[in-house]
Amino acid sequence: KASVGFKAGVKDYRLTYYTPDYETKDTDILAAFRVTPQPGVPAEEAGAAVAAESSTGTWTTVWTDGLTSLDRYKGRCYHIEAVIGEENQYICYVAYPLDLFEEGSVTNMFTSIVGNVFGFKALRALRLEDLRIPPAYSKTFQGPPHGIQVERDKLNKYGRPLLGCTIKPKLGLSAKNYGRAVYECLRGGLDFTKDDENVNSQPFMRWRDRFVFCAEALYKAQAETGEIKGHYLNATAGTCEEMMKRAVFARELGAPIVMHDYLTGGFTANTSLAHYCRDNGLLLHIHRAMHAVIDRQKNHGMHFRVLAKGLRMSGGDHIHAGTVVGKLEGEREITLGFVDLLRDDFIEKDRSRGIFFTQDWVSMPGVIPVASGGIHVWHMPALTEIFGDDSVLQFGGGTLGHPWGNAPGAVANRVALEACVQARNEGRDLAREGNEIIREAAKWSPELA
């Protein structure tokens, strides 16, 4: 049998990388891949190929294999199950030894696990469904700059979801008019307003002007309402240096929160920004622009729950997580699955919610999920019920589309939210009586009517 190791030429991966009797270690990073092999490629070979190509393997035996201990460093495909209802599709479980990964680098983790292997010829399609991050690895990350509890304490807001609004039209306003829209929304009763993800520093509105006018709006609204307000100042830029410059300026203005597009900006930039935010008391709002490029295909790419876990390690205090009810895609149980992965400390394996592994975050701070995209006041009861208190509900057109203007739109949202929270606390069923609750509130709030 030993001769197999050193025959020249192409050899089967499963001889080395398919190990069904392997007992996973507590320190292993575990991955669940949805594998669709090419016709004629057996499942064991496909699963082993994934393990090999994402760890130590190459297409043949190289003599330098003799200079290391492959048994210590190789990824192993340790379990394969057929996907029910799909022809020729399998979930392959792969265990990676911890030593394969650089400490505190989400970038390195993804380069290994979802690198070259996705272009592999023997596979028709490949999707990373879930990752189990062991405490031994997650402890090398600082995670979110502040987390849910610290954010509530900073804002002095408890017992309800937070309200946000993306300023529209997303592109084309001057800085002064943009600041005016921010002021009106915050004055009306929202907690946050938001730069759109593609608002960076364009010719019609340079970043520094926007930051200054938004800060002015913030302070004015705070003085008039007696509440702490925030505007997500988008610091995303073409270089990391420029991004940090913007974050520094936001801090100098006394802004409470900045924002980053973490997939287009990259995990390296995101982790740098998160470290700065923690050191300087800034909250960090994360937008997931580009996620659907990676996660929308059912059989290829990467599920959003993996991107969400990566973000919790890299660092962010808010992240967009779909709505379940608005204009963008998202199934309820699956969405709630990764919302729990973002917020909770310990999440049990539950395949019905798409959770393939039990995940223990060992006290890493949580991330607040943001529901955003095509939602409006009539969704409020459902959103309050689905997402609970630790969430940000973000209404863009649902605020600015109010026939009377921005401030009344904000008032309507705040009234609807307070009504839903009060009804829930009184024990009423939001799912069943939602519309009725909003209608009752509308009787004494002309903005909501």
From Swiss-Prot:
The gene is rbcL. PANTHER family: RIBULOSE BISPHOSPHATE CARBOXYLASE, RIBULOSE BISPHOSPHATE CARBOXYLASE LARGE CHAIN. It comes from Liriope muscari (Big blue lilyturf). Transmembrane segments: none annotated. It comes from the Eukaryota. Belongs to the RuBisCO large chain family. Type I subfamily. The active site is at residues 168, 287. Its main location: plastid. InterPro entries: RuBisCO (IPR033966), RuBisCo_large_chain_AS (IPR020878), RuBisCO_lsu_C (IPR000685), RuBisCO_lsu_C_sf (IPR036376), RuBisCO_lsu_fd_N (IPR017443), RuBisCO_lsu_N_sf (IPR036422), RuBisCO_lsuI (IPR020888). Its cofactor is Mg(2+). Keywords: Calvin cycle, Carbon dioxide fixation, Chloroplast, Disulfide bond, Lyase, Magnesium, Metal-binding, Methylation, Monooxygenase, Oxidoreductase, Photorespiration, Photosynthesis, Plastid. The modification N6-carboxylysine is found at residue 194. NCBIfam families: PRK04208.1. This is Ribulose bisphosphate carboxylase large chain.
